[in-house]
């Protein structure tokens, strides 16, 4: 009886807090210029992941994207069949992508392997420029950097809001999951490249699976030049982003920004509402910004 009363009391406290949180999030959305999402969608491999495989998850992923309606999405890991599926089913978005193994290993990975892909709302933005580079000492060539296990690539776009004329740069990346030196060098290289491409005064955003936690000194170059949405936004959470299909809980997926004000940040963990246990082995995250 005491446990039941305690549960009811805690529930009574939680519901008003949730209502306040939802109200604050709605207020932030009303003020925001853009909504950015980062989503490691988990690579497609026929027969892999059992009930959590891509075919079992893809309709739920579409439903989530349509429900959240982000302006720009940075994807990590999609293979060509996943990209084609998203393009066909989300025609309101244009996309820019690059495979980390493109132009090499053609016989083994004819589709370019894992990609980085940015989708942006056609009706809202004009694409001014775009590009890509490998995260290595030879960024213009297909290459693997330092002690990385895999080739890693970054994709970027420069977008202009059709209505307001405001411009910004958006970079989408994926750091190596094995090489510690590679992750450290990747953070330094990302800052150098963003400065070179976007300059110091432009609004710049970076999203991605960085395969390390925020408190790790490897990310210091990024933290010195940009702000994490989770830390900067007044409406935020502290939920994990890597779920490993229920096996682990880590925060390794990020949205960073420079010269933009974060209004809200969210980790989407309620995949059950879309009819699946997990949308991916990573939880999508999004942030609302004022330019």
Mark where each language-model region is.
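Soluble or luminal CAZymes and related metallo-dependent hydrolases
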Residues: 53-60, 78, 111, 148-152, ...
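Metal-dependent phosphoester-hydrolase catalytic domains
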Residues: 21-26, 124, 181, 185, ...
């Amino acid at each position: 009886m005491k446990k039941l009363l305690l549960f009811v009391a805690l529930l009574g406290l939680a519901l008003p807090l949730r209502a306040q949180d939802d109200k604050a999030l709605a207020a932030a959305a009303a003020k925001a210029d853009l909504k950015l999402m980062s989503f490691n969608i988990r690579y497609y491999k026929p027969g892999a992941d059992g009930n959590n495989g891509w075919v079992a998850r893809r309709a739920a992923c579409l439903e989530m994207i349509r429900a959240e309606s982000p302006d720009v999405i940075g994807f990590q890991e999609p293979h060509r069949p996943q990209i084609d599926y998203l393009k066909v089913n989300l025609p309101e978005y244009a996309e820019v992508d690059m495979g980390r193994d493109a132009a090499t290993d053609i016989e083994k990975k004819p589709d370019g392997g894992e990609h980085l892909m940015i989708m942006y709302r056609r009706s809202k933005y004009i694409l001014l420029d775009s590009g890509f580079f490998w995260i290595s000492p030879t960024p213009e060539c297909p290459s693997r950097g330092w002690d990385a296990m895999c080739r890693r690539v970054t994709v970027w776009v420069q977008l202009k809001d059709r209505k307001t004329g405001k411009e910004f740069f958006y970079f989408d990346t994926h750091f190596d999951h094995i090489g510690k030196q590679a992750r450290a060098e990747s953070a330094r290289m990302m800052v150098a490249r963003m400065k070179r491409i976007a300059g110091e005064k432009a609004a710049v955003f970076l999203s991605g699976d960085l395969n390390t936690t925020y408190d790790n000194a490897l990310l210091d170059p990024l933290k010195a030049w940009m702000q994490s949405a989770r830390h900067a936004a007044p409406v935020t959470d502290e939920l994990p982003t890597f779920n490993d299909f229920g096996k682990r809980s880590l925060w390794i997926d990020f949205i960073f920004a420079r010269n933009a004000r974060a209004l809200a940040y969210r980790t989407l963990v309620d995949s059950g509402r879309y009819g699946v246990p997990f949308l991916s082995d990573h939880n999508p995250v999004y942030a609302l910004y004022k330019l």
